[in-house]
């Protein structure tokens, strides 16, 4: 919920309309949760995710550690075009990414000097290699991909684990969606898959540079009480989009 366009709500950094840069420093001001659990939720009705969000933020005694949404289309793009990112982070960790990005940039600079090499040479090589890698997602996630359009990865800690588990069992006993509690492998896979979504879109553009004009990021501010949050673009715009 943002109020930059509402002068009545201007206070300090709020409503600065780009005239002020705000920096935040993350400090270890509270102990890390010793007990955490990740719940993978699937549904074909966005109202069910809205109910879960409102309950978690308004009724739970323990707030979620995180909540990550994935649409089926994004799931599919990341599955194909984020596979190598998934494996790199799984094997080497995120701390190695800067070195790998630097190597990628050097390869691309070299590729530009060699006339017969294609544009985005490194991306196309890595995409070819990723096709040779084994399947990286658990069967449970693939089953949910086939059954449900909307996915939510909900991470809880401490007392919130039992609280969320009890709520989800009760809620989905009377609704069309479902959930499962992730084991260690599923937890890692779900988080890495969600992480790979953004880079997968960039990879898709690079691999299909003869088809895709560019990426468009839509940053949409919603009111706190909006229940209908799923984007519905005008037909004249929607029919020009390859994937979203």
What feature does the model see in each segment?
Residues 1-244:
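Noncatalytic alpha-helical scaffold of FAD-dependent oxidoreductases
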